[in-house]
């Protein structure tokens, strides 16, 4: 791919909306029998991430207090060892994003979604004291003994404290994958991923079917359907209850910002699928891939930017391209959590982490059995992507990966597109490592 220097210019001009792309793969749909959950965490290119191992904690008292609002939750007396990828400015106590605990449970939190106006008018987000992405991993992962239990605990918290925003959260263990979506301030639905299927989400509520009599595959807030009826969000005379229609947003912006990402990945794994990017299109929730999906294929999916098509904004140098790519410059990190049930947990559970834009970064494996990470994993202060780090900051993994991205841009950019300032900056960055 050519002219990588245009990546930063193009994507920084596309706004700072927090957004992500999510992909799950069931064990019968994967190439090696693995369970896989993966997500690009898109926010700010300037946000350094800390990869941290939290040790087991005993005799805890008091409450966990969120970093970015007033949410609180009682601390468990005993908290399991767990891993996390924190924002640099949270004292490694919030915005954990993804990790595994010592019970072998993993999670990815969150996929930002937007619930419908009518649903939120009836049951608004509890923005000041409700649970948000900031706190979810820190509260759930230290105590969840299974993927199902993790989803249920998050649902219980939403019912009791409320959701402070719309989100989707994935849970994984050696037996199954669960995915929970908010419906409103206190309504939620969680679904078990069919073993032979994969699932894609791109900043929009995707779940639809709910069977309250099928406890093996569905969990939900107890008033999910009755509340929708009462508030006029669902009319039984029109057919089966549809969670997406009742509780999720679907507007013009979704057609260009979200639909193309779902369409692209579904057509990557099911090329003959009869869907188009068009207002009102209904994409299948779960699909069985034509060819089983490997971790390498998941990496390629998270690196997708419509390459080879007219919608590739980087090749066309078009910051006004309406289709939002999967791989963007403001990706803070991209993670893939893989569970290989036939192997010992210490090596069977792996986190692959790419710092920065996945198209320009490298996925580094972190095995659950690792007793400690390298010193650079938990370093990285505030700073702009164009600021030269100094001292210990220059050794942090995030800066090293950003430097690699910069050098790859240089190597793939014709000299005529570079000026002396850009060249000097890149040379200084290369010397910093």
UniProtKB/Swiss-Prot annotation:
Molecular-function GO terms, alphabetical: cysteine-type exopeptidase activity; dipeptidase activity
GO biological process, one term: proteolysis
Catalyzed reaction equations: an L-aminoacyl-L-amino acid + H2O = 2 an L-alpha-amino acid
Keyword Cell wall biogenesis/degradation among record annotations: no
Species, as recorded: Salmonella dublin
Protein's name according to its UniProt entry: Probable dipeptidase
Listed Pfam families: Peptidase_C69 (PF03577)
Residues forming the catalytic site: 20
Gene name of the encoded protein: pipD
Record's keyword terms, sorted: Dipeptidase, Hydrolase, Protease
């Amino acid at each position: 791919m050519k002219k990588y220097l245009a990546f930063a210019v193009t994507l920084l001009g596309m706004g700072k909306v927090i957004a992500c792309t999510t992909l799950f793969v069931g064990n019968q749909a994967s190439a090696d029998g693995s369970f896989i959950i993966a997500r690009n965490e898109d926010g700010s290119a300037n946000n350094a991430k800390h990869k941290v191992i939290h040790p087991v904690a005993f005799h805890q008292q008091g409450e966990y207090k969120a970093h970015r609002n007033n949410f609180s939750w009682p601390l468990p007396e005993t908290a399991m060892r767990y891993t996390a990828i924190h924002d640099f400015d949270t004292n490694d106590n919030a915005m954990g994003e993804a990790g595994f605990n010592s019970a072998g449970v993993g999670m990815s939190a969150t996929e930002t979604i937007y619930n419908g106006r009518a649903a939120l008018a009836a049951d608004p987000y509890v923005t000041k004291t409700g649970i948000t992405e900031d706190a979810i991993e820190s509260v759930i992962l230290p105590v969840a003994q299974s993927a199902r239990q993790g989803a249920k605990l998050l649902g219980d918290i939403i019912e009791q404290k409320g959701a402070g925003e719309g989100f989707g959260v994935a849970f994984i263990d050696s037996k199954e994958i669960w995915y929970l979506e908010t419906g409103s301030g206190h309504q939620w639905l969680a679904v078990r991923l069919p073993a032979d299927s994969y699932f894609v989400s791109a900043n929009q509520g995707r779940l639809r079917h709910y069977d309250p009599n099928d406890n093996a595959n569905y969990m939900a807030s107890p008033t999910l359907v009755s509340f929708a009826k009462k508030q006029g969000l669902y009319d039984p005379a029109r057919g089966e209850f549809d969670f997406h229609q009742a509780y999720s947003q679907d507007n013009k912006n979704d057609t260009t910002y979200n639909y193309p990402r779902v369409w692209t990945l579904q057509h990557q794994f099911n090329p003959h699928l009869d869907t188009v990017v068009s207002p009102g299109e209904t994409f299948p929730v779960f699909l069985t891939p034509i060819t089983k999906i490997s971790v390498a294929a998941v990496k390629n999916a998270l690196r997708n930017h419509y390459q080879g098509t007219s919608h590739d904004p980087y090749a066309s140098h078009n910051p006004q391209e309406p289709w939002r790519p999967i791989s963007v410059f403001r990706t803070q990190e991209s993670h893939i959590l893989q569970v290989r049930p036939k192997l010992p947990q210490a090596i069977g559970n792996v986190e692959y982490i790419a710092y920065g834009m996945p198209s320009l970064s490298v996925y580094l494996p972190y095995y659950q059995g690792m007793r400690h990470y390298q010193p650079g994993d938990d370093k990285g202060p505030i700073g702009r992507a164009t600021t030269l780090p100094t001292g210990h900051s220059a050794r942090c993994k995030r800066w090293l990966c950003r430097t690699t991205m910069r050098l790859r841009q240089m190597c793939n950019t014709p000299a005529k597109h570079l000026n002396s300032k850009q060249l000097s900056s890149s040379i200084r960055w290369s010397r910093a490592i």
